[in-house]
């Protein structure tokens, strides 16, 4: 992935969208692109929180494992990020994140992300807003007494013309 594509992805993310082009160029130099395939585990619950991930394309599932039970916490799409809480708290990852499709992520190491937060207060403020949003969603789910179910439809875009993977 070229540097201008990384900058464009940063501009479209909630976390970095308010930064100017010079700041985005600086951040893009610290970031690395990694690719995962469907069913790959991107991070495991319990691993050290060494980096922030920004989804460039694809869909991931965030799951928490308690005992032998797996709990789906969220589906994340392009523009979403994960790994922020572990970096801020310097604790192991609180969830396992797996690829549901081919996924490209931008990876920013912990120390680099912390220096970005110190240098760019607007990113820290946006991160606080995003984390507050996550907390409110979590509280709504707990208070409703019901499990919310979200459906994500992933179509195989590489099928032959005229064929479908649904219903056959």
Residue map of PLM features:
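Cytosolic regulatory regions built on CNB/CRP/Popeye-like sensor folds
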Residues: 1-166
């Amino acid at each position: 992935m070229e540097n201008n594509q990384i900058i464009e992805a940063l501009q479209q993310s909630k976390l970095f969208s308010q930064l100017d082009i010079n700041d985005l160029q600086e951040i893009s130099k610290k970031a690395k692109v990694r690719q995962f395939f469907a069913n790959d585990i991107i991070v495991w619950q319990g691993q050290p929180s060494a980096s922030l991930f920004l989804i460039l394309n694809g869909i991931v599932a965030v799951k928490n494992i308690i005992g032998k039970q797996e709990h789906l916490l969220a589906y994340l799409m392009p523009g979403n990020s994960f790994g922020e809480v572990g970096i801020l708290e310097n604790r192991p990852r609180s969830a396992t994140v797996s690829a549901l499709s081919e996924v490209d992520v931008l990876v920013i190491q912990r120390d680099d992300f912390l220096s970005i937060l110190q240098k760019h207060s607007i990113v820290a403020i946006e991160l606080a807003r995003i984390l507050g949003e996550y907390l409110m969603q979590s509280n709504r789910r707990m208070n409703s007494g019901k499990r919310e179910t979200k459906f994500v439809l992933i179509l195989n875009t590489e099928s032959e013309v005229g064929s479908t993977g649904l219903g056959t």
